[in-house]
């Protein structure tokens, strides 16, 4: 069966792409340029991951969202939360709003659906997960179910989106990812890029943005060696 995986280059989308690789005979990956500050590093990561997985990587330009987005991911005004803030809903909600790109996931998944239908793929894999679903509404199970309902009417071949990590937090994702890496005989986790910033060097993370902090905590709490290089440990 043919499938596509939405691959930003981050840990969640990498693990999801490994699941897609395991479950399907042929996969392709799609990556999006929405004018994000970390674009170059994300593209580098996505291309490398795709090569290791033996998947063709397609990049779509949706940088027009910069015209109406005030997100820190586009402007560079990215907050550095405290570690204790990660489990504080009010503080996490503030961070979420500061990096929210209007309708980003809706736009990306709609394009991914069209691409999937065009190449006759039946599945779209996404890295939506439980931890981010707490604050990001477009990571929730409600979003997944609603989007799949729209696909029943919006595509002829009834493409369906799968989110294999929907019930996992970051610690569980890191654990699952390491198990998949070993099972598939790959050395690939080190190529993921989670940072909101472009730190000039490939795969180098700032260590202070929310995404980096959640990544660090995930590997540490899972008891797994973190393959990531951080500017600030």
From Swiss-Prot:
What keyword terms does UniProt attach to this protein?
ATP-binding, Ligase, Metal-binding, Nucleotide-binding, Zinc
Q: What class of enzyme is it?
A: ligase
Q: Which residues bind ATP?
A: 7-17
Question: Where on this chain does Zn(2+) bind?
Answer: 195, 206, 209, 212
Question: What does the record give as the reaction this protein catalyses?
Answer: 7-carboxy-7-deazaguanine + NH4(+) + ATP = 7-cyano-7-deazaguanine + ADP + phosphate + H2O + H(+)
Q: State which Enzyme Commission number(s) the record gives.
A: 6.3.4.20
Keyword match Cell inner membrane: no
Cofactor(s) the protein requires to work: Zn(2+)
Query: One MF term in GO for this entry?
Result: ATP binding
Identify the InterPro entries for this entry. Answer: QueC, Rossmann-like_a/b/a_fold
Write out the pathway annotation from the protein's UniProt entry. Answer: Purine metabolism; 7-cyano-7-deazaguanine biosynthesis
* Cofactor, free-text remark: Binds 1 zinc ion per subunit.
Protein origin, superkingdom: Archaea
Q: Which PANTHER family match?
A: 7-CYANO-7-DEAZAGUANINE SYNTHASE
Q: Which family does it belong to?
A: Belongs to the QueC family.
- What job does this protein perform? Catalyzes the ATP-dependent conversion of 7-carboxy-7-deazaguanine (CDG) to 7-cyano-7-deazaguanine (preQ(0)).
- How is this protein named in the record? 7-cyano-7-deazaguanine synthase
The species this protein was found in: Methanococcus vannielii (strain ATCC 35089 / DSM 1224 / JCM 13029 / OCM 148 / SB)
Q: Which gene encodes it?
A: queC
């Amino acid at each position: 069966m043919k499938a596509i995986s939405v691959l930003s280059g981050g840990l969640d989308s990498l693990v999801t792409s490994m699941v897609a690789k395991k479950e399907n005979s042929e996969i392709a990956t799609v990556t999006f340029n929405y004018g994000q500050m970390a674009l170059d590093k994300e593209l580098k990561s996505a291309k490398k991951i795709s090569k290791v997985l033996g998947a063709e990587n397609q990049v779509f330009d949706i940088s027009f969202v910069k015209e109406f987005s005030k997100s820190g991911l586009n402007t560079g005004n990215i907050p550095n939360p405290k570690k204790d803030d990660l489990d504080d809903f009010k503080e996490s909600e503030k961070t979420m709003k500061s990096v929210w790109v209007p309708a980003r996931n809706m736009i990306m998944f709609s394009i991914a659906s069209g691409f999937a239908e065009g190449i006759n793929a039946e599945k779209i894999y996404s890295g939506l997960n439980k931890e981010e679903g707490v604050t990001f509404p477009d990571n929730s199970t409600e979003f997944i179910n609603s989007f799949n309902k729209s696909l029943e009417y919006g595509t002829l071949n009834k493409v369906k989106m799968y989110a294999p990590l929907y019930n996992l937090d970051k610690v569980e994702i890191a654990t699952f990812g390491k198990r998949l890496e070993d099972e598939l005989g790959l050395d690939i986790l080190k190529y993921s890029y989670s940072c909101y910033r472009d730190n000039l060097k490939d795969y180098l993370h700032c260590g202070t943005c929310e995404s980096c902090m959640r990544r660090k905590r995930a590997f540490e709490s899972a008891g797994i060696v973190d393959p990531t290089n951080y500017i600030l440990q």
